[in-house]
Amino acid sequence: MSSSMIVPVIDVQGNNFKELWAAMVIAIKTSSFIAIDTELSGLGSRKALLAESIEDRYKAICHAARTRSILSLGFACYKKLDNKADSTYLVQVYNLTLLCSEEYIIEPQSVQFLVQHGFDFNKQYAQGISYYKGNDKGGDAHGVNMRSLFVELLRANKPLVVHNGLIDMVFLYQCFYAHLPDRLGTFIADLSQMFPSGIYDTKYATEYELRFTASYLEYAYKKCKLDNSKAIAGGGNGSHVFLEFCKYTGSMQSYIDYRPCLDNQNQDGVLNICVQFSAYGWCPNGSQCSMSHDTDLIIQHDEKIREDKRKKRKRKNKKKGSQGPSEACSSPQVKRSHFEETELDQAVPISEPALTEQQKTASSEPTDATHAFEHGKAASKNGNEESQPEASSEAPVRPKEKKAEGGTHRAGFDAFMTGYIFAYARNLTENTEESSTAPLIPACLNKLFLSGKSVPLHVAKSTFSKSSKAHVHKMDYVWGKSTAVKPEGTA
């Protein structure tokens, strides 16, 4: 039922970073919102990352960000086209291959996972865009580099969209902004000022607004895409989400990776679906698992169960002659809670620490060093003044067929999927009379999903928290109050 789509993703690396700089900055400045995703070299202790205390959890993520690095950054710029029917967006997606110039830890699990999903470490070490972590050094902030690109992102003052994004935000801060503050309250205070238009977490939106059966990235994206396609095919009232991409010609073709989003095919009969992957989008057996990891089949299976239970409830209510209450099967917790009670202990890899009872009952999936519990990626756009790409609602034609990598896991395409989920959720909650400054999804504004917690992390400055000195100085530079870049030692 879902429609096919080919997403052009622009691969950005050291040999074309300056050439594509103007295009990236224009895409950022003209967007309605920006979705971001990262690939990391590791995360460290999984037990510490799921600590009951949020302050302890933050310290563990900080330690990971200071000792590990961002290997790849993806961002998708969604620009709403006001002259088009419904909710139509021009989407431009970029996938940046990065190389930290400082020593960092890279975990074997991360390498294995990324290689399985097509990450090219040879290309990273040969052509990765260099960056350093912590505070600014000298005049580097004024050049064409990652820190300057992050400044452009802040200056654009656009809503930022992430998926399960607390870890992403901590790594972005340490790698491209400044040294991380020691306390969570200070970090949150800084974050609230860095992104005044708000931060939205589609993991939170999927769990508590859309209330899907599962909330890992690929599942949420394909479910949104399927529901949107059904609504269009049904011809009912209401707005729908449509996407347009740029057409690329000439030398730009060599930079683009076309990522296919194919139709899901209905399959009858018993589906041998991996229960672990179905619940979390992650399986310890990886590609060696004998059960199906096909997200389309998983969604089809969930839809069938939902429909069967709806019919059963209808027959039961008809028999009783009364309208029964909606049952718990519509809750997104059911699949996970049932699975956790019966399968999780057996499915955890030997190399991972055993989950606590608090973690078992959490509505979250196991965490891999590189966000292995989420899947997808994409990129796009040319910024040459001489030959601006022409916008088109048609899927771009690929110059040659490329063999798809295992899965769709790349930072750029993950960012695209994150943005699509947000566009779909926004479309469901959109107020036609809202002002340009109103929150895009008020119920999800500045709420970061917390694994194992029933409440999100609110990105709002507390009256008891002060901003860090490095952040205050950096904000002066971002908004033009200061042209000097403070030495590295600023705390």
Where is each model-derived feature located?
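DEDD superfamily 3′-5′ metal-dependent exonuclease/proofreading module
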Residues: M1-A491
